[in-house]
Design a protein with these regions (language model features):
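Acidic/His-enriched low-complexity segments
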Residues: 20-196, 328-330, 346, 382, ...
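Hydrophobic alpha-helical and helix-loop surface patches within well-folded domains
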Residues: 25, 165-403, 408-409, 769, ...
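Metal-dependent peptidase/peptidase-like ectodomains
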Residues: 170, 177-178, 184, 768, ...
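Beta-strand-rich binding/interaction modules
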Residues: 368-369, 382-457
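Solvent-exposed alpha-helical segments and adjacent loops
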Residues: 472-649, 653-654
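A non-catalytic alpha/beta surface segment that caps or lines the substrate-entry region
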Residues: 661-665, 674-714
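Alpha-helical metal-binding/catalytic segments enriched in His/Glu/Asp
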Residues: 711, 727-785, 901
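C-terminal recognition in membrane/secretory proteostasis and scaffolding
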Residues: 909, 915-1020
Length: 1020
């Protein structure tokens, strides 16, 4: 088995630098930096392509301002051509700190003398000697970079590869996280593309916010580095640039191909790895349509760099879609072969789009002139329409006929158009490709089964201008609109009105055509054309926004202190949108002004707090795409499409197979449901203790009163010796009642134990955390949280009142296409940040649910004053049923749950201060007496993400009182008997006061009407 280090070592061994090109210039330089005086002095020699050596002498002040560039308000980065100052040094070839020889590539030996406590970074091998740093770069480069600062440096060696993190303040945990990621990404891309081309890679923290990728290092701003999603988005993108862009250089005469290719192999590939490739492409096409397609488009051959949303939509979006179409055209094997060959032959030289086309053609043996060149040289994109699509029975065979049109005014493109046909009785779709070179192409498909629907380009594989009904309305429709009006609420207090005005001003900066900004008092009606922002709950046009949102059942009414954003089409088929934005407090609006451009792909958002913090986001469903033809009445879902493997996979941190094996063992028939006080439950405890020991945990002696299984991973910081993070999951279930039906408890909660044990293995193998992490398999949860109550009450070296936070894993095995719900996120201010960060880092779908129904072991910790959450993959009809079996567990989902849990626990293990508890001083109070165990069940399946008031249900369990009473999906329970129900906990408490067999009135809201039905409760 190859280790990560050995993979990297093999890659480096094959990465010998090519001989310098004949037109390369070699520099031998000594530079001295005086940051306080903004001065650099340089002495040395340069040897030109003619072989003649010339002296170099430079003595100059360089202190150019750091200024925002272009209209890229969504990114907010500033730039400089060069600066030397006390905060740091940033010099590129454009800074003229050394003489340049035209466009010639360079090699160099550079020695930099620095003030005490300073260090420097550039290309090439790096060595230090006192206050001097030397760089030796044999690989031809486009320019010489010189960056300097006062950093705390962490370095690791992977065989011959040196990886470093240079941070302005010491942060060992952050450095370790980035160094782990560096090794992982370099190994993955070396395997995919060929050997990493340099002897080092460094993460360098800049003294202002930047996002630069240089050969062998990346220069990121301090805030950027600490954004949770950067390590799985921008960071691999910058590492990959060492192959394309900083390994093979862009021929400046041909257009910049490297950004699109890098975005495809990093950002898009990571989305593919998480099952989101089609969604990523849909968002890419929507961004092109909203920002560039109509007035700001240009050929790829003219793209040089991003400086606005429109240049990004073309230079990154259109380009990555070109590479995706090439991959679909020639196949994965030929696509990868072409990239590897290009890298091997063109490393440290300049390449063009034509070189890429030749590489793809050679690898595939195909003539790609018609399917490649037009995307580079032409402005625009095809627009598709499917018409006259019909299904008819001919004898014993069904025929589906139709015509696909290219409706753009320009010449047609050569296209391979994917089509998916959903057939009656078939789980998987029949997929084919229709090839077209003209404006119209007819097709005939045949099938034995009855066709139900046909979808054209269902996975957004073609670069094209989307029909507006193919994608949901999103903020990009407002930010990208040429004609846009922002309507402010005249009737609000002056502070809030000023904040809305400042928001409009911020968004107008850099716009080619500024938004028109007016108040609602100045208008009798909405503008007839263009997109519109309606600002403020009090705005008289809020009703118009609400009317436009009716198809999505969305509201614009104020809910507490939430800031809300909602987007709808102004009319069906219109590209113009109406965007509603409102916040109760002026302080929230400054944050929204800064943040919303980053959320351009979303249809709806909600924020809380002063910052404010995002707590809800999403895209409306697409319900009426013109690229879909239905042959049957009703809402017919598209059948499953063939799975596609990503071009490369990250090495898994967690074993799906091992977790499924744990579930199978605990839920096996021989375990008889792991009922209370049974030999089988004792056997489960022994299995768990053995697994913890094998994982490397210190397993504590069993408590004779309550058989919790406790494994400890001791922390490294002695000053935190009493502090801990608790990770919990209960291992008991309902056993085998008198009717002899076994309740396997696979999801509830063998799944939680499986994730807990896998996380223990991973964390124990990754070195000591700063704070002790305690893994607890609780018993007695089904009998009233007995095990967790015993843990909290019992004497311990890690007392409950020193626990920074608790993460509970309960019923986490049925993720599928749903979300990982994190219940109880309202128990501390920071949970929402931690949860959102975990979602960004892992790519897993997460939702922080502020309320906590209080049904599992986290409740015990919350009552003891410990901020605690439960991870949960949602209720289902098999809950507490004999049908909760191992075959229904989603192994891939367990991996995602484990990844999210690791992020939560790792953060808590390194956090240097307590969480900001929202438990109302519970830590200093005696926990309330339990209100009793719930015995009665209604059988409704709650929607845990519904914020209330009331409990919305997603369905009912078969044969349950709720089903018999006629409750159905979408109902909102507002009353049980005489008890009002505002939250899920209210419903749970109301049921505790009732018994099986009781008949109670259930009041629900259905389609805006309140109805009451009787239900006879069953045993839980």
């Amino acid at each position: 088995m190859r280790t990560l280090a050995s993979v990297v070592a093999l890659a480096l061994a094959a990465a010998a630098p090519p001989a310098a090109a004949a037109d390369t210039v070699h520099y031998r330089l000594s530079a001295t930096l005086d940051p306080a005086a903004h001065r650099i002095t340089v002495a040395g020699t340069m040897r030109g392509p003619d072989g003649k050596e010339q002296p170099v002498s430079v003595d100059k002040v360089i202190h150019h301002p750091i200024e925002a560039q272009g209209e890229d308000y969504a990114r907010g980065f500033a730039e400089t051509t060069g600066t030397i100052q006390s905060e740091g040094v940033f010099l590129s070839g454009a800074s003229d700190w050394y003489p340049r020889w035209g466009d010639a590539l360079v090699t160099f030996d550079l020695t930099v003398t620095l003030p005490a406590g300073w260090s420097a970074i550039s290309q090439g091998k790096r060595s230090k000697n006192g206050d001097q740093v030397r760089f030796s770069c044999e690989q031809p480069q486009e320019e010489i970079w010189l960056i300097a600062g006062q950093w705390k440096e962490t370095t690791r060696k992977l065989e011959e590869l040196e990886t470093s993190a240079l941070l302005r303040e010491r942060d060992d945990a952050l450095a370790a996280k980035y160094l782990d990621a560096t090794a992982t990404y370099i190994a993955m891309y070396s395997k995919l593309l060929g050997p990493y081309p340099y002897a080092k890679f460094a993460l360098v923290e800049n003294f202002w916010e930047t996002g630069y990728g240089m050969p062998s290092f990346t220069l990121l701003g301090g805030k950027v580095i600490r954004l949770p999603f950067i390590i799985t988005s921008s960071y691999p993108h910058e590492i990959l640039h060492n192959w394309f862009g900083n390994g093979i250089y862009v021929d400046p005469k041909s257009g910049n191909w490297s950004e699109g290719l890098t975005a495809y192999l990093a950002d898009h590939m990571f989305a593919e790895q998480n099952g989101g490739g089609a969604a990523y492409r849909q968002e890419t096409l929507q961004k092109y349509a909203d920002y560039a397609a109509h007035a700001k488009d240009f050929p790829l051959s003219e793209f040089r760099e991003r400086h606005s949303p429109s240049t990004e939509a073309v230079g990154y979006g259109k380009s990555l879609m070109l590479f995706h179409m090439m991959r679909r055209e020639i196949g994965d094997a030929a696509f990868v072969k072409a990239l590897r060959t290009l890298y091997q032959e063109k490393r440290f030289s300049r390449s063009s789009f034509d070189d890429l086309k030749s590489a793809f053609a050679t690898a595939s043996g195909k003539n790609l002139n018609a399917s490649f060149a037009p995307w580079v040289t032409r402005t625009g994109a095809p627009q598709l329409r499917a018409r006259d699509v019909q299904a008819a029975l001919h004898g014993d065979e069904w025929r589906v006929t139709g015509t696909i049109e290219q409706t753009q005014a320009e010449e047609p493109y050569t296209l391979a158009i994917p089509i998916a046909l959903t057939l009656e009785g078939k789980d998987t779709a029949t997929q084919t490709v229709v090839r077209t070179t003209g404006k119209e192409t007819s097709f005939v498909l045949t099938a034995k089964e009855k066709p139900l629907r046909l979808d054209v380009d269902p996975e957004f594989d073609l670069f094209r201008v989307l029909d507006v009904e193919e994608a949901p309305p999103a903020l990009s429709g407002a930010f990208g609109a040429e004609a846009c009006t922002m309507i402010l609420p005249a009737g609000v207090n002056p502070e809030v009105l000023t904040a809305y005005q400042q928001m409009a001003n911020a968004w107008n900066e850099g716009r080619a055509t500024p938004m028109k900004v007016v108040t609602d008092a100045e208008l009798a009606e909405l503008p007839q054309t263009g997109s519109v922002w309606v600002a403020g709950f009090e705005n008289k046009f809020a009703k118009a926004a609400a009317a436009a949102l009716e198809p999505y059942h969305a509201s614009v009414t104020r809910t507490g202190d939430r800031a809300v954003v909602r987007v709808a089409r102004r009319s069906k088929g219109s590209a113009d949108v109406i965007a509603f934005v409102a916040a109760p407090h002026a302080v929230q609006l400054s944050g929204l002004a800064r943040k919303l451009p980053h959320y351009h792909k979303y249809s709806y958002l909600a924020f809380e707090g002063d910052e404010p913090v995002n707590v809800e986001k999403g895209r409306w469903p697409v319900t009426d795409s013109p690229m879909t033809a239905l042959f049957a009445a009703g809402d017919v879902p598209m059948a499953k499409l063939a799975t596609r493997d990503p071009l490369a996979e990250l090495p898994p941190a967690f074993s799906k197979e091992r977790m499924l094996a744990t579930v199978n063992a605990l839920a096996a028939p021989a375990m008889k449901g792991r009922g209370q006080k049974t030999p089988e439950l004792d056997r489960a405890a022994e299995m768990i203790a053995s697994a913890m020991k094998d994982a490397g945990l210190e397993v504590l002696p069993a408590d004779p009163e309550m058989k919790n299984v406790v494994g400890v991973l001791r922390g490294a910081k002695p000053e935190w010796k009493e502090s801990s993070v608790v990770v919990g999951a209960h291992y008991d279930h309902l056993g085998m009642p008198q009717d002899a039906k076994m309740f396997p408890g696979a999801d509830d909660n063998a799944s939680g134990i499986a994730v807990l044990l896998e996380l223990a293995r991973q964390m124990a193998g990754s070195g000591k955390p700063s704070r002790t992490v305690i893994f607890v398999a609780f018993t007695g949860e089904e009998a009233g949280l007995l095990g967790s109550k015993r843990y909290v009450a019992a004497p311990s070296p890690w007392p409950a009142n020193k626990t920074i936070g608790m993460v509970n894993l309960d019923t986490v095995g049925r993720l599928a296409s749903g979300k990982i719900l994190v219940l109880g996120a309202g128990s501390a201010d920071e949970w929402i940040h931690i949860v959102n960060g975990a979602g960004y880092v892992t790519g897993a779908p997460v939702s922080a649910v502020m309320n906590d129904p209080g049904g599992s072991d986290q409740k015990t910790f919350i009552e003891a004053g410990v901020p605690a959450v439960q991870l949960f993959t949602g209720a289902n009809a098999d809950y507490h049923q004999p049908t909760d079996t191992p075959d229904k567990i989603d192994g891939a989902g367990l991996v995602k749950v484990a990844a999210v849990t690791r992020e939560l626990v790792a953060y808590l293990a390194e956090r240097d201060r307590p969480l900001t508890s929202k438990l109302g001083g519970a830590a200093s109070k005696t926990a309330a007496a339990p209100s009793g165990e719930r015995r009665a069940s209604l059988g409704s399946i709650p929607d845990y993400e519904f914020p209330g008031p009331g409990v919305r249900i997603t369905g009912t369990t078969p044969g349950s009182p709720a089903e018999k009473a006629g409750l159905k999906e979408g109902d909102v329970i507002t009353k049980l008997g005489a008890t009002s129900v505002a939250t899920l906990r209210d419903l749970s408490e109301a049921l505790k006061a009732l018994a099986p067999g009781d008949t109670v009135d259930v009041t629900v809201l259905r389609d805006g009407q309140s109805i009451t039905v009787p239900a006879t409760l069953a045993a839980r």
